[in-house]
Swiss-Prot record:
Cellular component, GO, one term: cytosol
Pathway membership, UniProt: Carbohydrate degradation; glycolysis; pyruvate from D-glyceraldehyde 3-phosphate: step 1/5
Family, as annotated: Belongs to the glyceraldehyde-3-phosphate dehydrogenase family.
Molecular functions (GO terms): glyceraldehyde-3-phosphate dehydrogenase (NAD+) (phosphorylating) activity; NAD binding; NADP binding
Gene source species: Aspergillus niger
This protein's name: Glyceraldehyde-3-phosphate dehydrogenase
Active site (UniProt): C151 (nucleophile)
Binding site for D-glyceraldehyde 3-phosphate: S150, C151, T152, T181, T210, G211, R233
Enzyme kind, highest EC tier: oxidoreductase
InterPro entries: GlycerAld/Erythrose_P_DH, GlycerAld_3-P_DH_AS, GlycerAld_3-P_DH_cat, GlycerAld_3-P_DH_NAD(P)-bd, Glyceraldehyde-3-P_DH_1, NAD(P)-bd_dom_sf
Database matches in Gene3D superfamilies: Dihydrodipicolinate Reductase, domain 2, NAD(P)-binding Rossmann-like Domain
Catalyzed reactions per annotation: D-glyceraldehyde 3-phosphate + phosphate + NAD(+) = (2R)-3-phospho-glyceroyl phosphate + NADH + H(+)
Superkingdom to which the source organism belongs: Eukaryota
Site description Activates thiol group during catalysis, residues in chain: H178
């Protein structure tokens, strides 16, 4: 039986997790909580999306929530996670997608309302992080609060895993050229902690920090301390790209690297890692399910031990799909 899921926070990731769950079929969304939007507005936001298009299905409202494709979904408006009555809906697995409750202690408040597990759709300072295809098999059923890491970590980790397993990574630097997100500004506005981040998103290339590369060391312990990185926020609405420049232990050719990644994309990382030799640009990957799509034509090698690898990701859709996949996976482990 499909695990019953609740979503806390109906913003970008919350809504796209919802859409993916409807398409996925392996999880059953039964409830949503968001104190900042009313039910009829939630229906509107779910139906129309500037990036991913109209919802392919039916959406109605009733006195207690939404009716999506004929199925009733409860809608709550609680500010305190501990006050959300997940238990009354049968929701065992909660997607914590507000971006606010990202520590184990804060996210665990959902358990007080009857939930059994919480998956944080963001990096966490202290919750164990899992990346599908990389370290998800290390999950054990005693873990109640976990993180799906970040969209960028989900892109970088499968790429780094294949390269490290086959050739060994001595050290590396990552840059993500990242589409703007909801935390950025439409016009120049105050941003006391990050002055550059307060500048207009649609007019600027904005250097920024990211913990995504360091986080790879948490999901692949042998790479701990070997990777770090930064971000360039750019004026595109969706789809981002990772540039991993690394020094290899084992001398190899770029063709051998391509072969290793192509093999992985067709076998152990199928559905997680994509591979393309087409002359694609970012918009071609809008709505792509993969965590990471290696661009064979975009990378270069300086010599047999020093390479630049390029991999794309839909930072909204692909990441949200992995949230759903992670819940489907851990529910099977929990049932054993």
């Amino acid at each position: 039986m499909a695990p019953k899921v609740g979503i806390n926070g109906f913003g970008r990731i919350g809504r796209i997790v919802f859409r993916n769950a409807i398409n996925h079929g392996e999880v059953d969304v039964v409830a949503v909580n968001d104190p900042f939007i009313e039910t009829h507005y939630a229906a509107y936001m779910l139906k129309y999306d500037s990036t991913h298009g109209q919802f392919k299905g039916t959406i109605e409202t009733y006195e207690e929530g939404l009716i999506v494709n004929g199925k009733k979904i409860r809608f709550f408006a609680e500010r305190d996670p501990a006050a959300i009555p997940w238990g009354t809906t049968g929701a065992d697995y909660i997607v914590e997608s507000t971006g606010v409750f990202t520590t184990q202690e804060k996210a665990a408040a959902h358990l007080k309302g009857g939930a059994k597990k919480v998956v944080i759709s963001a990096p966490s300072a202290d919750a164990p992080m899992f990346v599908m295809g990389v370290n998800n098999t290390s999950y054990t059923k005693d873990i109640n609060v976990l993180s799906n890491a970040s969209c960028t970590t989900n892109c970088l980790a499968p790429l780094a895993k294949v390269i490290n397993d086959k050739f060994g990574i001595v050290e590396g630097l990552m840059t993500t050229v990242h589409s703007y997100t909801a935390t950025q500004k439409v016009v120049d506005a105050p941003s006391s902690k990050d002055w550059r981040g307060g500048r207009t998103a649609a007019q600027n290339i904005i250097p920024s920090s990211t913990g995504a590369a360091k986080a790879v060391g948490k999901v692949i312990p042998t790479l701990n301390g070997k990777l770090t990185g930064m971000a360039m926020r750019v004026p595109t609405s969706n789809v981002s790209v990772v540039d991993l420049t690394c020094r290899l232990e084992k001398a190899t050719s770029y063709d051998e690297i391509k072969k290793a990644l192509k093999d992985a994309s067709e076998n152990e990382l199928k559905g997680i890692l994509g591979y393309t030799e087409d002359d694609i640009v970012s918009s071609d990957l809008n709505g792509d399910d993969h965590s990471s799509i290696f661009d064979a034509k975009a990378g270069i090698a300086l010599n047999s031990n020093f390479v630049k690898l390029v991999s794309w990701y839909d930072n909204e859709w692909g990441y949200s799909r992995r949230v759903v996949d992670l819940i489907a996976y851990i529910s099977k482990v929990d049932a054993q």
